[in-house]
Structures are given as structure tokens and as C-alpha cells.
Amino acid sequence: MKKVKIGVLGGYRGSSMINYCVAAGNAEVVAICDKWEPALKRHQEIHPDTDITYYLDFEEFIKHDMDAVVLANYATEHAPFAIRAMKEGKHVFSEVLPCQTMKEAVELVEAVEKSNLVYAYGENFCYMPAPYEMKRLYEEGKIGEIEYAECEYIHNAEPIWHSITYGEEDHWRNNVYSTFYCTHSLGPIVHITKQRPVRVFGMESHKTERKLRIGAKSGQFAIEMVELENGGIIKSVHGHLYKDSHYYQIYGSKGRMESARPDTKSGNIHMLYVNADEYSGEYGEEKIEAYKPTLSHAEISKIFGHGGGDFYSMYYFVEKILGDKNADTIDVYEALDMALPGMFAYRSILAGGMPMDIPDLRNKEEREKWRNDTACSDPKVAGDMLWPVFSGGNPQIPEEVYKRMMLKHIEEFEANTGYVNAAFTQSSEQGVEAREHSNDIMMRDE
């Protein structure tokens, strides 16, 4: 079997993708690049008997003999690296998010179109058991056409913030606005229904206490109210509310389906409830189905992170490169359908809640309006179009907050404890288990 040669940019978040490549029958990792040398050393320890080349310098890495690049670098920097990789003739798997500005969005779309290469957006929440089964049911017409949906990605990252920002004041996580990181909530609904978001208004919490004490400048959570092209409505909630939750619900024209709420202890994102009539207007006896979906490659997918989503997003990416036109990847247009509602929700927030139309960059004429739009909250990118991180104005955070976070990160890393070390330990264990199941990954979907 031909194997796709893959390089991974970002040794920390990229660990799961690296393990997929090490274990897979359809791919192999040939290069890893990270500016943080300890990450490279950890992978050398985890994968001692492999022909992997390690790079600190991206310019050297991108010249390596490889077919594809996984972008697991900072979430605000994916578009420029994706464009560069495609110019070098590499297929691209992009972690979330696809771009930071509309200028980048236009350039990314045009780079993909020009390259004729595979661009896959790695929104792994789309491939978790419940939302992925919801996609299958929706496509077969189980609940009819979407009328309303709710989705939420709640992750109170305060306990691990020092580990994932290193105490750096200018780390992207401390400086993105509240609606930016929206595709873990919105993405699955877009992927399930294939309906394009056309209009949005946003709201953000003005409660910031928990964010300020960890050095983050945005509101604690945000809401996007999204209108779809068929007139359906989505309510998307995401951010740092106190207790974590991943949840998806869709009301269709003849029924409803939803994943389990986490506090029910019934399976969370692995459990699905379906209540649908045979036809709209039947109003017959309630027919509630409750079950844990079993997907293809279910056993091997359990080894990987995000409810198996890390497995399926990579598996389909590689299969698409190998020629499977039906491989369920998320292309650049769908990636922007997932991400632009967050960008334009913040424009709405800054405009006092005014609804905003969402551009469709499939339309070449529509691109011209946005070709030079650099508006974002990153001063290195925005130029004279800089947004505040928080609609109430950027808060002043004492330097001591970042010093405290940095010290805690260093202490844990040197003691081989904490979130980062646990992630690498999990990666090592994951890699061993994945290699034991490597033959499973060689199986093609029927």
C-alpha cells in the first residue's frame, strides 16, 4: 500500500496526528518541526525507531521530501503557513482555525483553487460519535430539514492556562476576541446540514473575572445567533463558563436529535437521542431512540483524542490524497462557513449588536470587498484595522499575573508534571497502542 509522507508543524498539539502517521497503514510521518526544542526531544524519545527528521526552522522543514503538511501551530497563524505549504506543492491539513482575517481568507481560498491540492480543515468535533451519526441521519432525511439548532463548546481552561500559554502575555490565547474560536460549536452543525451561514449577530459576556486572573483579555464566553441559507437558525455558545460541556441539538421539519448532556452521565458526546415522525404532520406515537453510535474503525478511533475525532479527520485527509473522492474531509469553503460567523459576530458586537451578512467567498466578485481587510485583534497583522480584544476595551492586566503563570508552567515542566507533560505521556501511550492496532487503519471503508 502506498503511504502518504507527512510532515507535522507543531509537536505539542500535533502529537495525535504524529501518532496516527506512525501507526497508520496509509501514512507515515517523515518530519516534525517545532520552535520549542523540548517538544522535539520528547518526540525523539517517544518514537526512537523511526526515520523522522526533526527541525527547529520552518524554512528547512518545508523543503523536506514529503507529500503533505499538518499545521498544528498557533490557531491565528494557519492561513499563511497553509498558503506557503501549497506553494511548495504540499497537501495541507489545517488545525482550527483556518484564518485570522478576511484578507487571509481570500488568499487562502485562492491558494487552494490554484494549487489543485487537498486542503482539509481539521475540525475534529465533526467526527465525534454523536454529531457524526447525526450527519448520517440528517443526510438520509431522518428529521427533515433543519429549522433550529443549538451547539455549545464550553471549556473552562483556567486550571491549565499556564500550561497552554506558558505565561506569555502576547500568546494568541490571551489576545483573541471571544467569538474567534467558534468552530468546535458551529462546525458540526454546518457539517451535518451543509447549510451555509448567511447572517449573524453576536453577544459577549462582560463578566471577565476568571479570564483576567489568568491573563486573558476577552469576555468569558460568547454567543453567535446564525441564520442559515434555508432560513434555519443556530444558537452557538462557546467559551470559559465554569463547567465544561459539548452539546449538539437539531430540530428538523419532522423531528429532533441531540447528543446527551454531560451531567446525565449517559455518554455525553458518545450518546444520541432521536425523536422523529415518518413525515411532517404525522404526530403519531412518540418514537424515541437512544443509543451509542458505532462508527467504522470504532476501536482504533477510541485511542485517539477528542472522542475519536482526531483519528477520522486524519484518516479521511490521507484517503482523499490517495484518491478517494468520497473521503469526508472539510474543504476550504466549508471551513470558512464554520469560521466566518465568529469573525462577523465580533463585528456585530463592536457595532452594538447589529446583524452582519456573512460573505460567501465561493463568489469571486465578493472577494474583492475583503481582499485587503486585515481587521483582527492581533497588532502584528491588523495594521490600522486593529480591534480591541474585548468590546469594552482591552483590560490592563498586571505583569505579575504573567510572571505567576510562567513560573507555574516552568515548575511543572521541570518536575515532569502538569498538563503539557501529561499530554506527552498520553501521546507515548497512545502511540504504543495505536501501533498495536495499525492493521485496523489499513482497512478501507466499504
Tell me the role of every PLM-derived stretch.
Residues 1-48:
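N-terminal Rossmann-like dinucleotide-binding module
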Residues 12, 118, 125-216:
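Predominantly a Rossmann-like dinucleotide-binding segment in NAD(P)-dependent oxidoreductases
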Residues 38, 49-111:
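Beta-loop-alpha module in the N-terminal Rossmann-like domain of NAD(P)-dependent dehydrogenases
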Residues 94, 119-121, 150, 259:
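Hydrophobic residues in well-ordered beta-strands that form the structural core
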Residues 124, 254-331, 370-436, 442-446:
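C-terminal glycine/acidic-rich active-site capping loop/insertion
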Residues 179-183, 187-277:
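Glycine-rich, aromatic-lined ligand/substrate-binding cores of catalytic
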Residues 331-390:
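A contiguous, mid-protein "functional segment" used to position or interact
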